[in-house]
Amino acid sequence: RELLDVDGNFLRNGGSYYIVPAFRGKGGGLELARTGSETCPRTVVQAPAEQSRGLPARLSTPPRIRYIGPEFYLTIEFEEQKPPSCLRDSNLQWKVEEESQIVKIASKEEEQLFGSFQIKPYRDDYKLVYCEPQQGGR
């Protein structure tokens, strides 16, 4: 079964989408922020302002298919027009840090060393699920 965007269209493999909460009043879309002692915004966070759609994210799956279904493992990568200079050498692909389980932006050296995500139906909406490499994620 294919997944649908907010306009009722199938999610395209390699397509760019804003990831926002299913319900109003729960904050905005996903964006990057500095957390802890970071000098560069590498942490994926939810925008506090409901009006913010966040950053567009490209959803891609290795099989050359046209549309994405819930069974496919995805890479998620922000598509920021003008990334901060500290991120210019990164592809803005998401990773989950093992110890803290926080979603971060991977550096070039880390690109192939982490799991992937799936989009799963949840009630009348969808949720992102992280898949460890040994679970089938890359």
Swiss-Prot record:
Q: Where are the transmembrane segments?
A: none
Q: Name one GO molecular function term.
A: serine-type endopeptidase inhibitor activity
Q: Does the keyword Disulfide bond apply?
A: yes
- Result for mutant: L11F: In less than 10% of the chains
Name the SUPFAM superfamilies on file.
Answer: STI-like
Annotated effect of mutating L4F: In less than 10% of the chains
Feature type site, description Reactive bond for trypsin: R64, I65
| Annotated consequence of substituting V6A | In less than 10% of the chains
* Keywords assigned by UniProt, alphabetized: Disulfide bond, Protease inhibitor, Serine protease inhibitor
| Outcome, altering K108E | In less than 10% of the chains
The free-text function statement in the UniProt record for this protein reads: Inhibition of trypsin.
The protein depicted here goes by the name Trypsin inhibitor DE5 alpha chain
This chain's source organism reads Adenanthera pavonina (Sandal bead tree)
